[in-house]
Amino acid sequence: MKTKLYLPIISLLAMSVFAFISCDDSDSDTTKPVIELSEPEEGQELKIGDEHGVHFEMDLSDDVMIKSYMIEIHSNFDHHSHGKSRAAATGEATVDFSFNRSYDISGKKTAHIHHHDIIIPANATPGDYHLMVYCTDAAGNETYIARNIVLSTTAEGDDHHHAE
């Protein structure tokens, strides 16, 4: 009778010890993913109103597994002097451009990303912007890369177009 009582207790104790050993942090993923952004380049001028979109290309990698990446573009006008903007000088109505989109790429250790999803509308305010790319792995480690870009009506359009 006592054997029947001790067996469940010993089994529960053994499972608890196994669970604590399995939770050892020495095997957890603490390495951030790597971003190698090819396009757009630092300081690159991007054409406002180009219906083909911005040529965006990068390679992502992680030692275990990538989960997602996010692209963010926002204005960087605050570092300028307080002169008149092009919109104020010409009387044209423009809007500060922003872009924020996440992409799920779960299940891969490496990914080559190439697309033209970023469309800069014709009424975007020309000037300096920040392009931020964030990458998160399956363990929640995040890394980012930042680029300074310029939106311009006089920039040359991108000749690098592919059918998706």
Where are these regions (language model features)?
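Bacterial Sec-dependent N-terminal signal peptides
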Residues: 2-5, 15-45, 156-164
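Extracellular and select intracellular beta-sandwich modules with Ser/Thr-enriched
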Residues: 31, 142-147
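Short, solvent-exposed loop/linker segments at the N-terminal edge
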Residues: 44-52
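Extracellular Ig-like/FN3 beta-sandwich strand-entry sites
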Residues: 51-53, 66, 126-130
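Extracellular acidic, Ser/Thr/Pro-rich low-complexity tracts
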Residues: 53-65, 75, 137
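Aromatic sugar-binding surface patches on proteins
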Residues: 95-117
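Surface-exposed, short loops/turns at beta-strand junctions within beta-sandwich domains
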Residues: 110, 122-127
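Conserved structural position at the C-terminal beta-strand
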Residues: 133-135
